[in-house]
């Protein structure tokens, strides 16, 4: 929703410029930025960073807990975070900012976050949920069509989950090239 329209505009304006896109966790993206192997990173909060980085929030989003058809009976109830532990949970892997975010939420409720399935990237969570392998937290805007079609179901939590942000991160000590600067500013 954020990146693809910008890439489309950039490609139309600069059809001869090649783009390399990496898909990784926020900590891995920040390490790539620190090492200089990427010009800038689009990451999700929470973001831990050094003073050498500038982080700009570009869009807020809300995660929602979702399940597949075999657990659809849960959608009729209001359930607490603690009740989620009775069902298999799917999460990004330990060391990701998303894992840390949910670990903190569970800890605030006196619980240990222990997902049954951990995946390397967020795009793997939805297929696992659709195939009834557990409950996952996903950005609401990314699953709206799947919710409307009845492929997956949103669970109603007692607890409020804080909004998160999509951010652009860049190294203040490194000047962006013309192409990277144009892309970032779109």
Could you say what each language-model-derived stretch is?
Residues 73-74, 88-109, 176-180, 184:
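Secondary-structure junction motif
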Residues 1-14, 18-23, 27-31, 175-178:
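N-terminal winged-helix
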């Amino acid at each position: 929703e954020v990146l693809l329209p910008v890439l489309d505009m950039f490609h139309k304006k600069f059809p001869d410029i090649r783009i390399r896109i990496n898909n990784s966790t926020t900590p891995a993206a920040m390490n790539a930025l620190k090492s200089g192997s990427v010009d800038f990173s689009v990451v999700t909060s929470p973001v831990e960073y050094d003073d050498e980085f500038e982080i700009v929030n570009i869009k807020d989003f809300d995660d929602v807990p979702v399940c597949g058809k075999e657990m659809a009976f849960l959608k009729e109830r209001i359930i607490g975070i603690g009740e989620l532990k009775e069902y298999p949970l799917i999460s990004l892997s330990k060391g990701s900012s998303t894992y840390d975010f949910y670990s903190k939420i569970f800890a605030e409720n006196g619980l240990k976050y222990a997902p049954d399935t951990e995946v390397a990237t967020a795009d793997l969570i939805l297929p696992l949920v659709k195939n009834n392998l557990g409950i996952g937290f996903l950005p609401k805007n990314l699953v709206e069509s799947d919710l409307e079609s009845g492929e997956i179901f949103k669970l109603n939590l007692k607890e409020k989950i804080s909004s998160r942000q999509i951010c652009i991160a860049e190294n203040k000590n490194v000047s962006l090239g013309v192409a990277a600067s144009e892309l970032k500013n779109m």
